[in-house]
Amino acid sequence: MGKVLRDIWILHEHGIAVFSRVIDPNIAPQLVSGLFSALYKFGETLSHGGISNFELNSIRFTIEKMNHFIFITNSSNNVKPKRVMNELKKIAKKFFNIYPEVVRENWNNDINLFKNFEEKIIDSLVDSV
């Protein structure tokens, strides 16, 4: 199965970007995380469940919330949503397996802990140009 995820952001439910891998260097992770966090909260308020995906032109954003973290990725809208969601859930499970302290809530909020996470998920990510 080929790589389908372009960019990925992992946010704490309070809006802090703990990890991001973005191909375009002009996109500031903390700025985007604020937008995604607000959008997700808005969706939760309206639908009592949050937003699972949305599209902008030819890009689909897929969102999954687990254990106080929001996982967001984007991909071509030509890729089946179920395939993207399965890949995102696989990454989320890997995140919690590698960093179990964040689940136990004894994490000290140091985002440097996650700086090498890209190496663990590289097989899911489209190569950067």
Task: Provide a role label for each language-model segment.
Residues 2-7, 11-129:
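Acidic, low-complexity cytosolic segments
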